[in-house]
UniProtKB/Swiss-Prot annotation:
This is Spike protein P3. GO terms for biological process: virion attachment to host cell pilus. The keyword Transmembrane does not apply. Interacts with P6. It is found in: Virion membrane. Keywords: Host-virus interaction, Membrane, Viral attachment to host cell, Viral attachment to host cell pilus, Viral envelope protein, Virion, Virus entry into host cell. It comes from Pseudomonas phage phi6. It comes from the Viruses.
Amino acid sequence: MRYQGINEWLGGAKKLTTANGEIGAIYLSAAPPTDAARADAKAVDFTAGWPSAIVDCADATRAKQNYLWVGDNVVHIGAKHVPLLDLWGGTGDAWQQFVGYACPMLDLCRAWGLGYASASVTTGSLQGYQPSAFLDVEQQQFAKDNLNLYGDNCLDLATSSSAQRAFLEQCMGCALPEDCIFGWYVKMDWEGSAVADAYAAIRVQGFATVMAPWQSVGGAGYVYARVPQKGAWMGVNLLAYVHGTSGQPAYGIPMTLSGFTGNMGQVASKWLMLPLLMIVDPHVVQILAALGVKRGTKSDPRTTDVYADPKVPASRISGPMINGTVAPPATIPATIPVPLAPLGGAGGPGAQGFQVYPVFTWGLPEFMTDVTIEGTVTADSNGLHVVDDVRNYVWNGTALAAIEQVNAADGRVTLTDSERAQLASLTVRTASLRQQLSVGADPLSKTSIWRRAQKADYDLLSQQIIEADTVKNLPAVTFAQANKAAGGQSETLWHQMYRVNDIAGDQVTAIQITGTMATGIRWSATAGGLVVDADEQDAVIAISSGKPVKNSSDLPTADAVNYLFGITADDMPGIVSSQKEMNSEFEEGFLQKARLWNPRKLVENVQNAYFLMVYARDRKQFHSLVASSLAMAKLGVSTRACKESYGC
């Protein structure tokens, strides 16, 4: 039975009572809603065909303002029985089709955060969109303060009964509140309006999902995220429900393509679910810091942007807010080019907002299959070239054959049998390393193993191939990578990247990256321009207007951040708190020695401005995340916001 979990927890029919009174009786049925049930839903002003109420107070009027979806069950709220309609009004697993995995909202404690506006959204009124079932763990007043936002079914654990507490702890899989990792949310101040605070939600163990409650008050909006922990990695999906009334831009931040499926469609005529960002990294705190996240407190998480793990230094959780607008297309197609549209679009920035849509930047092994990367490089005497990083990929025969073909065309000697044998051994050891990384619970030990092995592997490859042959005009070399080849571990996620190194002045043209997400989305990108660090530890790939871009000269350390992003270290206290910390924390990496190309030129060339990916070698991928996150955000903000916030 699809809804066995919640039936077991709730015991069929269950009454939940808080200090504020009875929430309501809940009844579940596996049968699709009947015509009569749909008619009854209409009678209480629910929009047939869209998610409707689940758990709410006995007051049916309140229920109209608290939409939440669990499937196609029928839930009784007071005397009314209200159908829980599938996402598009069908009877199948619409949620699974929507996000690519089984519905995570089968039980009450997971049932907050996803709702849809009523038909009135077409007039710009969002009165129906207020997700319910916020489970408060702090104080009764906190719950009361959230009634308008989350409905009347806030559970006040401070004064709740032992039975209620036991129910929630069973549902959560951990004791409350001490043993739970609280959620994150990112508050974003949209241009032209203040933002209503969003609140940290209790995380549900094992689900790397994020829902985005969205409320519009004169253009205000917010995004909140739950960040669970699973093994050695933490994942964040930041989503935004973007909307726009006639003649107005929709609000959102164009970031990156996340792990969601196919055509996301329109929820209503003016609604669209847009995935913004996917991060999988053990240092999520520092990532969110780059996105403007600040530390919250257990006593009042509303005062700041994040309720953070207390073991994380507060100094690492602060940073600038990010502003932006985006005008979404009518639907997101199943095939998503990168980018979907140039910055500006018809009317230019400020007229319709920046039309920059999901851009894939990282996380290949987690979501991708049959990934290929093809590139054409003109190399100089330094001798490095578009080659696969065999520390991370299994070096395949296609790539070898292509290199040999180029070598032969240049009158060079192809790989010897000995070199082939050594390369084969390297492939085996790399695969073995992946297996090592897929077991065990200590991320530091994994990191240590990974870094030692990858360094040795890279040295071997460098000595035997790169230094022996200066490849010129490398044609369309294909690098294939099996999905989850590295076991899905974060330490390898960040290394499953296109490796370019030590180019120092080379030009790269026509980089083509294609792949299929595990959930079915096909994505691709074609553009030119390359920026890399001359140091082997780091590489930054910047996709410009499709024209070759030479590396800049070395930059003074103090100017590196400002040069790249148009902001200074003083603007990013959570990113770079001091020069001393930067030098030690980043191991003389990206911010010190990178040869950086100024992406402000991208903003100037708004019709063809792309920024694709950042690569980092070591476990402190923090600086890479900062680079890609801020660069993407910079390109996604409106002209006014850019000037006000970044001085561009």
